Amino acid sequence: MQAPPPEHCPGVESEQAGLVSACAGCPNQSICSDPSKKLEDPGKALVAAAMKDVKHKLLILSGKGGVGKSTVTTLLTRYLARSYPDNNFGVLDIDICGPSQPRLLGALGENVHQSGSGWSPVGIDDNVCLMSIGFLLGSVDDAVIWRGPKKNGMIRQFLSEVDWGNLDLLLLDTPPGTSDEHLSVVSYLRDDNAPESLHAIIVTTPQEVALLDVRKEINFCKKQRIPILGVIENMSSFRCGHCGNSSEIFPAKTGGAAAMCIEMDVPLLGSLPLDPLVTRSCDAGEDITAMRNETTEALATICSKIMSSL
């Protein structure tokens, strides 16, 4: 039997497991430092079984909070579902402390039902379903105040106990940064026998304070061996509804996402404008992807690149 981990345990999946100073004196140190002795998490087998009919998993990541990652997840889901009606799409909201997808996808107040095959995700459209902790709270104002292990347990339940059915693509809306949630979901979904099934998209805004954290997110993906489909620059410009002039709300001091992508050797999928119509529609849970405007034209290019890369 393994002993409880030390307070600053790097985690058994870490390359530093059993090797850093926090591991000194831990009775599990010899197990963690020797790959041949590491125990397989039984949850991985459960997740693999539950995900066997999900062709592709796509992590939507952002190094910095407030860059519109959840909104981009919603826009991608809506546009993909409309453009590829024969495909099935799912959204998993693993931002445990700040779930946004029920509101953004117009599913506030919906309930999750349980059957013999697990939790049934909430249907959004004919070919879109959603699972979020937001459906399990008593009120939309309830705070989720959980430490890492409890968050990880919830994520494992979402991955192993939700009856997703046959999905062509599952989009995972993640919290900002590289926290417990990210390490947990990657450890469960990464399959060395099928590395092409898990990918990532990284969302940023043009200013350097966001790009600084995006570089860290890119390095996280590279260290975790997650292929990056590309970067989406959100809120790249704003077009005035009165005069029609375009301006930069977040000026790109160092060349924005385009320069950063060249520097980090990752693709730039495209740029989305700061669109008041998107803000209003997401607050109301409405779909604007049938309209033809600057946002949907950009989405068409981005979604085409995503589907051709999978």
Curated annotation (Swiss-Prot):
Q: Which GO terms describe its cellular component?
A: cytosol
- Which superkingdom, per the lineage? Eukaryota
Record localization: Cytoplasm
One annotated GO molecular function is: iron-sulfur cluster binding
Cofactor(s) needed by this chain: [4Fe-4S] cluster
Q: Which residues does the record give as ATP binding sites?
A: 63-70
Locate the residues binding [4Fe-4S] cluster 1: 9, 23, 26, 32
- Please tell me whether the keyword Lipid biosynthesis is annotated for this protein: no
Q: Assembly and interactions?
A: Heterotetramer of 2 Nubp1 and 2 Nubp2 chains.
Q: What is this protein called?
A: Cytosolic Fe-S cluster assembly factor Nubp1 homolog
